[in-house]
UniProtKB/Swiss-Prot annotation:
GO biological process: protein folding
Gene Ontology CC, one term: cytoplasm
MF (Gene Ontology): adenyl-nucleotide exchange factor activity; protein homodimerization activity; protein-folding chaperone binding; unfolded protein binding
Subunit structure: Homodimer.
Family: Belongs to the GrpE family.
Gene label: grpE
Matching PROSITE patterns: GRPE
Function as written in the Swiss-Prot or TrEMBL entry: Participates actively in the response to hyperosmotic and heat shock by preventing the aggregation of stress-denatured proteins, in association with DnaK and GrpE. It is the nucleotide exchange factor for DnaK and may function as a thermosensor. Unfolded proteins bind initially to DnaJ; upon interaction with the DnaJ-bound protein, DnaK hydrolyzes its bound ATP, resulting in the formation of a stable complex. GrpE releases ADP from DnaK; ATP binding to DnaK triggers the release of the substrate protein, thus completing the reaction cycle.
Record keywords, A-Z: Chaperone, Cytoplasm, Stress response
Top-level taxon of origin: Bacteria
Protein name: Protein GrpE
UniProt organism field: Bartonella bacilliformis (strain ATCC 35685 / KC583 / Herrer 020/F12,63)
Length: 222
């Protein structure tokens, strides 16, 4: 059945006579028109299919680009998070360790104050009131200095009786002692200090030798 816009309708063929040349021409024109319409529909279908394929390809391309952008975003976010953590750590380290050199110098001053106090004979200190007051003033100054350093994160290392640790201790000499395990700190010659997790100055110590080895001590206790 023909479309209403087609000039060839059912009524056009009601009285057609195939023997009549004019009617045959009419039928031929109708057939040509139908063929043209059919070919037009095929072309439209082909165009639609092509557009569909192009849309599918475009969608796949967009999906790939979206995935790539997502990966880039995730990598950037991870880099930013690492930078944030590193910045926080650097700021914290700067806050803790910014006074390290100053603290190390103040420890030398503290050592000198202690040496000055040790140089005062005990009897002279007791018999001379002025000397006694001077010594007490020096002691107060030294304590206040160490309290200030401790307030800023400086801690004293007191390793006597502990296992020798080269990261925190400096062995100055050995002490023969068979009663304690080897490498036990027996004497502290000069106190050590740390700030945060860093060593400002290792403790200078004497280390026991000649006692039971650490492994044998652990085996005996087991």
């Amino acid at each position: 059945m023909f479309d209403e816009k087609n000039k060839f309708t059912d009524a056009s063929f009601e009285n057609c006579d195939l023997k009549n040349p004019a009617d045959r021409d009419t039928l031929k024109q109708a057939a040509d028109e139908l063929l043209k319409m059919h070919r037009g529909k095929e072309e439209v279908c082909a165009d639609v299919e092509e557009e569909k394929n192009e849309s599918t390809d475009l969608l796949a391309t967009l999906q790939d680009e979206n995935k790539e952008l997502k990966d880039q975003f995730l990598r950037l976010a991870a880099d930013m998070e690492n930078l944030r953590r590193r910045t926080i750590r650097d700021v914290a380290d700067a806050k803790i360790y910014s006074i390290a050199n100053f603290a190390r110098d103040m420890l030398s001053v503290s050592d000198n104050l202690n040496r000055a106090l040790e140089a005062i004979p005990a009897d002279a200190r007791e018999s001379d009131t002025n000397l006694k007051m001077l010594a007490e003033g020096v002691e107060m100054t030294e304590r206040a200095m160490m309290a200030a350093l401790e307030h800023h994160g400086v801690k004293k290392i007191c390793p006597e009786g502990q296992k020798f640790d080269p990261n925190f201790h400096q062995a100055m000499f050995e002490i023969s002692n068979s009663d304690v395990p080897d490498n036990t700190v027996q004497q502290v010659v000069q106190a050590g200090y740390i700030i945060g997790e860093r060593v400002l100055r290792p403790a200078m110590v004497g280390v026991a030798k000649g006692g039971p080895k650490e492994n044998s001590t652990e085996a005996d206790s087991a």
